[in-house]
Amino acid sequence: MAAAAGDGGAKPLQSAMKLANKAIELDTGNRPREAYVEYLRSIHYISQVLLEDVENTTEAGETVPPETSKMLKLAEQCLERAQSTATKLGRICLKPAVPAAPPTPLPTSRHRRVCSDEGGKLSPFLPPEIFQKLQVAESQNSKKELTPLEKASLQNQKLRATYEARMARLDPSQAMQKTSLTLSLQRQMMENLVIAKAREETLQRKMEERRLRLQEAANRRFCSQVALTPEEREQRALYAAILEYEQDHDWPKHWRAKLKRSPGDLSLVTSLLSHLLSLPDHPISQLLKKLQCAVYSALYPIVSRAATSAAPAPGSCSLPPEANGLLAPGSRRLRSSQSLYCMLSPSEPSAAPRVLDGPPPTPSVPTLHSGPLDREADGSPAGPSSPLVDALSHLPDKDSSFEDLEQFLAMSEPQTPGAKREPLLECLKSTVKDIHNAIDRLLSLTLLAFESLNTATSKDRCLACIEEPFFSPLWPLLLALYRSVHRTREAAVSRSMELYRNAPPTALGIPTKLLPRVPEAQASTYPYCTAAQELGLLVLESCPQKKLECIVRTLRVICICAEDYCRAQEARPEGESQPPAAAIGADDLLPILSFVVLRSGLPQLVSECAALEEFTHEGYLIGEEGYCLTSLQSALSYVELLSRGRLDK
């Protein structure tokens, strides 16, 4: 059926996502043993499906489908979660060996983990000193050329081993030969040390001369000023280190030649940055590790204090059951990134439906009457009024649009935030500023090393290549801080998801023409199920750019499903050759997206979007990605408002 075209293409992926989501729910409910079993079951299912696909493949050169990479990514994240859960279970098993404690503090120790389980990392997080050791381990394991003295020491060890072997073969009566061998060994060892010392002194002198020469080149590259800021001095020293590195390696010259031959090839830029950041001894890679450790060390105590000071309810992932102030100040408006090197990249052709073009709309939601709801599209019989209608009927009499709902919600939030939120907000602002500055430093140093990358499109690609390795180990901890700041908002969204999980699509204002003709199975699938599954993949990523791409794909899947449903509805009259209506309008997009958000069961999307809003630069915010992010934020605000209306009842 055409209506199911958007929902039937990724059944194994959907099943794997359901297993993973079940495991996540068990883990957030503080049931680590059951969660551990579900994580292993998810991994086993994915492995079995992929193995069957490979065994059924007849052609050796057949390409791997896109679903395979997604399932491998999901399996990787489940494996990391299972490992963290196993570690947690090990600590729980060791607790009985500790001297008995009063029964009252036990619940507190059970809820000491930080509320952040996205990106494949489970809390508690690693201490900063261990994180730093892991980050610098690769640099220490890299091959290092031996100095002349070290080479001489190895030669002397071999000479001594040979001497001892020959001495063991001599008879006790051959004292003269033993004395000769001893004197010969001492002479050779002394000669090796003298020659090595002379070579090392010469090498050090040449290295110092080269360092001074490269330092002069770095000074000429920068504006010679009498008083330099510490940042400028550090940048100049790093540039001199890059010049010194390139004296011993030829690959930068080869890459510059490739970029000169193909200046507009962005794939070369991606390959260059991937190769550069994979070398732990390159100054840019070392700076990235250093900045990562600095940000992690600043985040860890903040998140730890926020986790221990919170008073979580059992099974709620540290979210309070009630929400007094549902919105953090300034959390809905798109802000410009603070990056100095974020340039507007030319818009690339997109295959997105027409609904994704143009400025963000202010769609209206049809008025929900207090009578029986139309449940035909969802396959359930007509019955008494839904709680969704009761909640919305108690809202003030306003124009029923998402923009007005958002404005009403903004007016209802308290004017003075709680005392506990102010320090967290200040810490968050400071951390965000540090991250922007760190990325700016990495980007500027990369552009200094490879001047041919100093174009708008190449800068954007460099920024994307730098952000992925930079954010990957930091995102779980950074998201935990965002979730602490937006705790009340997530609580409201979570409550709405629990209250209206089974609400029919028509209750949110979705017209029947954009729903399947035949009701879909309630247990396994529902309208726009594929879009909800795609949105669920967002929490598995740890890079802002990939998370943004996931949001764009979600809206595209919504448009595809809506067009399929609409085409199936309009295909009823026989002999009608008129093409179906155009893509769905903005008035229909946000109600559908709100329904998808409700069905996703992911209240942490509030914090994810707040972080994406901050770390997405202008080139994307004014394009399709920014439109999709704004639409998702509007849908989240509407879902949050549903809980507000219910609580006001």
Curated annotation (Swiss-Prot):
Residues 487-648 form the VPS9 domain. Disulfide bonds: none annotated. The keyword Phosphoprotein applies. GO terms for molecular function: guanyl-nucleotide exchange factor activity. The keyword Phosphoprotein applies. InterPro entries: MIT_dom_sf, VPS9, Vps9-like, VPS9_dom_sf. Pfam families: VPS9. One of its GO terms (biological process) is vesicle-mediated transport. PROSITE patterns: VPS9. SUPFAM superfamilies: MIT domain, VPS9 domain. The modification Phosphoserine is found at residue 116. Residues 348-393 are annotated as: Disordered. Keywords: Phosphoprotein. SMART domains: VPS9 (SM00167). This is VPS9 domain-containing protein 1.
